[in-house]
């Protein structure tokens, strides 16, 4: 009995076009050869005019930019096919380090005084105060276990879903991504409580009760609960 040949390329039609599942164990040259053969055998012409989007999934195979371009070129040379995305389940060490820096929580215990700037790439957990004239900046969220009376800029690299939270919120200025908010009205003595700031659906920064974060940003870690 003839042994069935391992399929390195699987083609599935979807409502958005076609999806190519490429084996991650065979050699890249074998993969290209079978991909070319299968795309030549299957004729995708749609209505003869519109382009058909192709989504490529390569599993646990890392592709260099050159290899990605080889796949794009091969598919592009077939009638009416255009690559919409190439997805891999693996990343380079450099990409992993960058991702870790952008998503990790950086705990720092200090007082940020006037004229000082504290800047982290990921999420900032500051145990201490930000005095008037002091600035804290984070690529992600900012949590201040203390008084925020200076300037805070969360989502520094463009993350509009970032939030700012503080035990005492009396800032000079709040910024989230590219949206800024001037100092809110000073609270009366004894009225201070833990609060959070976020960008609402109207693209304005809103300051509200910290407890609302659970509903506003359900994907946040449980860290903010420890600030209450």
From Swiss-Prot:
Gene3D superfamilies: 2.160.20.70, 3.30.160.540. The keyword Cell division applies. Pfam families: MinC_C, MinC_N_1. Keywords: Cell cycle, Cell division, Septation. SUPFAM superfamilies: Cell-division inhibitor MinC, C-terminal domain. InterPro entries: CAP/MinC_C, MinC, MinC_C_sf, MinC_N_1, Septum_form_inhib_MinC_C. It comes from the Bacteria. One of its GO terms (biological process) is cell morphogenesis. PANTHER family: SEPTUM SITE-DETERMINING PROTEIN MINC. Interacts with MinD and FtsZ. Cell division inhibitor that blocks the formation of polar Z ring septums. Rapidly oscillates between the poles of the cell to destabilize FtsZ filaments that have formed before they mature into polar Z rings. Prevents FtsZ polymerization. Belongs to the MinC family. This is Probable septum site-determining protein MinC. The gene is minC.
